[in-house]
């Protein structure tokens, strides 16, 4: 078990007035899953809050053992990269995220969206007798109907010459397809 919240099927989260849920390692929403957020009210001063802001470093030395290890490139809310026993890895296609209300703050890691998915072209790589097969990673659907949504892409310390490939909302670099629809609310990305 990992500290990352993992959705299975349809998950509805209702943020009651004055509540604050912090998902320190984010919320995983992979293909086939739908994560919908509601708020009890529309008053910014009282509506519930959801924070899914990932740390820049998170036990990279793997001193704590997990059966399914979240890897770098995790979205604050969305799909991620995971490694199972040894070096067997998978980068997930994205699911469906619907935000109807609430005060939402999200930040992904380097190579991931704050709300969306991981940076990768293929889900997994394997070789066969006939050559290489790539299973293309698909973008998901993100709809914002209300609430206050604040995202920030991962940023390296000032002066670091490395490029950062992250976005606030949407499919991250190399993902195929996907959509972002904003029907209402306040969005700062």
Question: How would you label these PLM feature ranges?
Answer:
Residues 1-189:
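A composition-driven surface/loop motif
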